Amino acid sequence: MATTGRVLLLSPPSLSSHPEKLNTVLKSHTRDKTDLQMLDRLAHGLVSLPESTYDIVLLLTGADNTLAETHSLLNRELIQRVVHSLRPAGKLRNRENKPWGLSDGNGNNANSSRRYNDDEQRFRNEVILAGLVFDDKGELLKPDIGAQQAIPLKLGRRRKEKEKTDTLASSANYITNGTVDAPASNGISAPIPAAKTTENNPVPPGVGFIDFSDDFGMPAEDDLEDSDEELIDEDELLDEDDMGRQIVQPPECRPKPGKRRRACKDCSCGLSQKLEAKDKAQRATADKALETMKLGSSELAEVDFTVQGKVGSCGNCSLGDAFRCDGCPYIGLPAFKQGEEVRLLNNDVQL
């Protein structure tokens, strides 16, 4: 089977122990245009394939004259590398040159097992995912996409054409032979030279203009009336029955046993407002209770800081905490003279 383009032979590892079969395959191809690679070395990444090089990639059968071993080694990554090595319009063939996915004309093969059929079907799906297509003869072909071309999108074409038509129609009434008839102060129209075009005044390099009239493909206002798209009124989404339903508290907002109820972040069930109102009420009650305990500037109060029934025994009670014992009833009070009366005036200790 002689070929004119470059050919890549992919051999399973079992064929290396049968050199006579491998030599038979090599004799049918031009040696200077044929490359031979072992599938196991490709699968382990020991060798690489050049991109867009081969016109034909030929899968060889194993020692059992089937493609079972070849299909088992061709995983998705390896198939993609093989497809990338094909040139545009290149073909992927097998040794028997049979249509892919078919064992024979009746769909049966005496030498193939159930596992072989599954691998064959998997291989067929993978090569399609890799970008190959079937031609009229049932061969796998890499499509020639060709050079990609940028296609300009004409946005707001109808609106621009309408504005252009209106502009030309209005300018035809005023512009004649390159002049514009403008009314003078005495009521007589005087010709005024028309504005110079961009051909006479080219745009300086690096200067751009923004076209604010471009609607970027949005339909014009006149087309909105003819549009079949219906606008939804958000006020009609909920009726009175929906508004009157009881709000179901989410499980994460429910307090755990023995803990205070806390509102979650971005609370929408009303618990946050309820807790804030409760805290304000408690704060107002506490402030009101503190108001009754405040003393005026002219009011005096006598407070006995000593513990009832407890008397100091160290004799240093009036010297301060540094000299007092642990059980002293005057701990926390400043030093004082024995027998001096202690008074509180506006929360200041007066000795």
From Swiss-Prot:
Question: Do you know which Pfam families this protein is assigned to?
Answer: CIAPIN1, DRE2_N
Q: N-terminal SAM-like domain: where is this region?
A: 1-151
Q: Region (Fe-S binding site A): which ranges?
A: 253-269
Q: Where does [2Fe-2S] cluster bind?
A: 253, 264, 267, 269
Motif Cx2C motif 1, chain ranges: 314-317
Q: Where is this region: Linker?
A: 152-243
What residue ranges carry the coiled-coil annotation?
Answer: none
Positions of the UniProt region annotated as Fe-S binding site B? 314-328
Q: Where is this motif: Cx2C motif 2?
A: 325-328
Which compartment or compartments is the protein found in? Cytoplasm; Mitochondrion intermembrane space
| Keyword Mitochondrion attributed | yes
The record's region (Disordered) falls at: 93-118
Q: One GO biological process from the UniProt record? A: iron-sulfur cluster assembly
Keywords (A to Z) from UniProt: 2Fe-2S, 4Fe-4S, Cytoplasm, Iron, Iron-sulfur, Metal-binding, Mitochondrion
Composition-biased stretches (Polar residues): 105-114
> Where does the secretion signal sit in this chain?
none
Family label: Belongs to the anamorsin family.
How is the quaternary structure described?
Answer: Monomer. Interacts with TAH18. Interacts with MIA40.
This molecule's function is given as:
Component of the cytosolic iron-sulfur (Fe-S) protein assembly (CIA) machinery required for the maturation of extramitochondrial Fe-S proteins. Part of an electron transfer chain functioning in an early step of cytosolic Fe-S biogenesis, facilitating the de novo assembly of a [4Fe-4S] cluster on the scaffold complex CFD1-NBP35. Electrons are transferred to DRE2 from NADPH via the FAD- and FMN-containing protein TAH18.
Q: Which protein, by its recorded name, is this?
A: Fe-S cluster assembly protein DRE2
Q: Which gene encodes it?
A: DRE2
